[in-house]
Swiss-Prot record:
Coiled-coil residue windows: none
Stored InterPro entries: Ribosomal_uL6-like, Ribosomal_uL6-like_a/b-dom_sf, Ribosomal_uL6_a/b-dom, Ribosomal_uL6_bac-type, Ribosomal_uL6_CS
Pfam families registered for this protein in UniProt: Ribosomal_L6
Protein name: Large ribosomal subunit protein uL6
Gene name of this polypeptide: rplF
């Protein structure tokens, strides 16, 4: 049995936590995040820490409490430090540019690909083949990165495509005659 829920989430100075039933709102310098927790979870805010436990009558109380603890810990980190995700474009002529909140990609198609960024997410291109996504919500950043990667996933023979910066693409050997 995992004991994740037993550890409290420390709330640093400058972070405001509001608990309204099962709706938790966390506000910090990088923005405000809100999440509705499962009914099986009970959250208490005391001594600059959030503690978690199961409610009576729910069989999966501890499991849901561990999930809630991990989600709220990510929210606290997001509103204080923020999250970043880096993508690389590998391939001849593959380019990226950011105009406002739109990422423009040239990925070898007959048309450019424009991807609208959701609110709270910013993108920048240090080089034409790199994209850096920044924001407070870890889940949204991961989803945007997955959406950008899905336009041209790395292919297994040359590794061309959009990949995460820390991703290792397994390449196959070409067919022999």
């Amino acid at each position: 049995m995992s004991r994740v829920a037993k550890a409290p989430v420390v709330v640093p100075a400058g972070v405001d936590v509001k608990i309204n039933g099962q709706v938790i709102t966390i506000k910090g310098k990088n923005g405000e995040l809100t999440r509705t927790l499962n009914d099986a979870v009970e959250v208490k805010h005391a001594d600059n820490a959030l503690t978690f436990g199961p409610r009576d009558g729910y069989a999966d109380g501890w499991a849901q409490a561990g999930t809630a603890r991990a989600l709220l810990n990510s929210m606290v980190i997001g509103v204080t430090e923020g999250f970043t995700k880096k993508l690389q474009l590998v391939g001849v002529g593959y380019r990226a540019a950011v105009k406002g909140n739109v990422v423009n990609l040239s990925l070898g198609f007959s048309h450019p690909v424009d991807h609208q960024l959701p609110a709270g997410i910013t993108a920048e291109c240090p080089t034409q083949t790199e994209i850096v996504l920044k924001g407070a919500d870890k889940q949204v950043i991961g989803q945007v990165a997955a959406d950008l990667r899905a336009y041209r996933r790395p292919e297994p023979y040359k590794g061309k495509g959009v990949r995460y910066a820390d991703e290792v693409v397994r390449t196959k050997e070409a067919k022999k005659k």
